[in-house]
Amino acid sequence: MLSCDICGETVTSEPDRKAHLIVHMENEIICPFCKLSGINYNEMCFHIETAHFEQTTPEKSFETLAAVQYENSDLGNTKLHSTVEVTSGIHSACASNFPKESSESLSKDRTLKQEAFYTESVAESRKYQKSREKQSGLSEAQGSIYETTYSPPECPFCGRIERYSQDMEIHVKTKHASLLESPLEDCHQPLYDCPMCGLVCTNYHILQEHVDLHLEESSFQQGMDRVQCSSDRELAHQLQQEEERKRKSEESRQEREEFQKLQRQYGLDNSGGYKQQQLRHMELEVTRGRMHPSEFHSRKADMLESIAVGIDDGKTKTSGIIEALHRYYQNIATDVRCVWLSTVVDHFHSSFGDKGWGCGYRNFQMLLSSLLQNEVYSDCLKGMSVPCIPKIQSMIEDAWNEGFDPQGASQLNNKLQGTKAWIGACEIYTLLTSLKVKCRIIDFHKSTGPSGTHPRLFEWILNYYSSETEGAPKVVCTSKPPVYLQHQGHSRTVVGIEERKNRTLCLLIFDPGCPSREMQKLLKQDMEAGSLRQLRKCVGNLKHKQYQIVAVEGILSPEERAARKQASQVFTAEKIP
């Protein structure tokens, strides 16, 4: 005879027992106390031991019987019963987590751990019982729906693994007895609160181990924080290095762009000089239909001839302006008390070959045109004519090679020919000194009047022209050459100064940027006062931060020339104020 492992019913054969077991599997598990259903067997056992604690209080080990009711809708009210052995010690450990029977409850984490342990212990008890039945010949057949793979139980407190549940029970009761105890009402058992998480312990040593775990966790977290902090510092350092690299790269790029811009501005970008610029412009005029090809070839031939002989072709020159100014001030001007004019000087304006960079060269041509017409300078300038711009560049290079102004030569790479490099007061001084012309540079390095004006500049030029005469007539034609006037970005030539009846001063200036057609208006017999507007510059019209002038004062002896060449090794200018 065979019996059912679940309800104990006796059957006659093995097939009948299997059919009987299938009926059990199809039935629904129902709580015998509250009719709860819809859960599995382990969950039902846990439900009974927790929700119906008073009805199932354990008496002793392996003597608690939990009656579980199975009901099948097809079989009506048929009731089957099975017994489940539960270790009372494990049950006590689980039950101690509920406040119904205890004045003090353990923490939530410990409660869940013991509940899990209880459920596992119940399952292990059933496995142990089945193992014993199997050894006695009452085990179920191979292929039974209840056959499961056995796994050794593990201690939930220390992780120790035992072969059988009974051994695990003994281990838990002997090694972890204090963890299974729970404080009861009316018991004066001492309690210890964890200062970190509030967990209540009944044993001081357990509390100490628990706190040590907190400290180890805290130490680990601090170590992780240090690692994270170190990583953050390394990342910040890398970001800083990347930012510094980008900043330096951007600064280097800006420096290159600024340097290239300055090179273009000062004609040092290897784009050719006067000849190349003139040819490009004439070719462009032919392309636009503004110049006939025959005219192009004619102008090109004239330009090449002028460069070859080194003499300006005179196509940008206007002569006779000083004489016209003398007539105007003598006969027409009524608001001027006195005017001082330089020696005769020709006006030269910029051409297409030097447009944008040739003002310094054109002003030198004006100054030299005046010196060539002055007998005082005929000896040192004997046989000279007004040179073209490429010839002026060659003359300055010769002065550098002779030893004049080495610093200025270095700044321009010792080369002017074939470039569009600007020249200023220092180059004019160097060239005149090399020609034995005595001159001086005066630097008006800051304003000396209100609103950034330079009244001291006007006073100096007045003294320069009026020093030869006293009680002079209204118009004075002096023997003084014109004055080279330089400021940031441009240069002009001062050919005289007028003093009005209200004692204000106005400079008379030739600008190389003014074309010939405008200058020729000054040659008319009936010249009007409005025509002088382009020449007159009063104090309020000159407001640049700094001005430099080059004034010619005579001829140098060979000794003076050598001394000035030596002095130009460290170039200095006279400063006013």
UniProtKB/Swiss-Prot annotation:
zUBD/ZHA: annotated span: 248-273
Q: Which UniProt keywords apply?
A: Acetylation, Cytoplasm, Hydrolase, Metal-binding, Nucleus, Repeat, Zinc, Zinc-finger
User: Hydrolase: is it a keyword of this entry?
Assistant: yes
Chain spans, region MIU: 225-247
Gene3D superfamilies from the UniProt entry: 3.90.70.130, Classic Zinc Finger
What is the active site of this protein?
A: C359 (nucleophile), H490 (proton acceptor), D511
Enumerate the subcellular locations listed in this protein's record, separating them with semicolons.
Cytoplasm; Nucleus
ZnF (C2H2-type) spans are 2-24, 29-52, 153-176, 192-214
Chain segments annotated as transmembrane: none
List N6-acetyllysine occurrences by residue: K261
- Example of a GO MF term: zinc ion binding
Which EC class heads this enzyme's classification? hydrolase
Q: Show which residues form the site (Involved in the stabilization of negative charge on the oxyanion by the formation of the oxyanion hole).
A: Q486
- Region (Disordered): which ranges? 231-262
Source organism's superkingdom?
Eukaryota
Specify residue ranges for compositional bias: Basic and acidic residues: 231-261
Q: According to its UniProt record, which reaction does this protein catalyse?
A: Thiol-dependent hydrolysis of ester, thioester, amide, peptide and isopeptide bonds formed by the C-terminal Gly of ubiquitin (a 76-residue protein attached to proteins as an intracellular targeting signal)
Hey, which family's this protein in? Belongs to the peptidase C78 family. ZUFSP subfamily.
Q: What is known of its domains?
A: The motif interacting with ubiquitin (MIU) and ZUFSP ubiquitin-binding domain (zUBD, also called ZUFSP helical arm ZHA) are responsible for binding the distal (outgoing) ubiquitin units S1 and S2 respectively. C2H2-type zinc finger 4 is a ubiquitin-binding zinc finger (UBZ) and required for polyubiquitin binding, possibly binding the proximal ubiqutin, and for catalytic activity. C2H2-type zinc fingers 1-3 are required for localization to sites of DNA damage.
- Subunit field text: Interacts with RPA1 and RPA2.
- Name used for this protein in its record: Zinc finger-containing ubiquitin peptidase 1
Origin organism is Rattus norvegicus
Q: What is the lineage of its organism?
A: Eukaryota, Metazoa, Chordata, Craniata, Vertebrata
Gene that this polypeptide is encoded by: Zup1
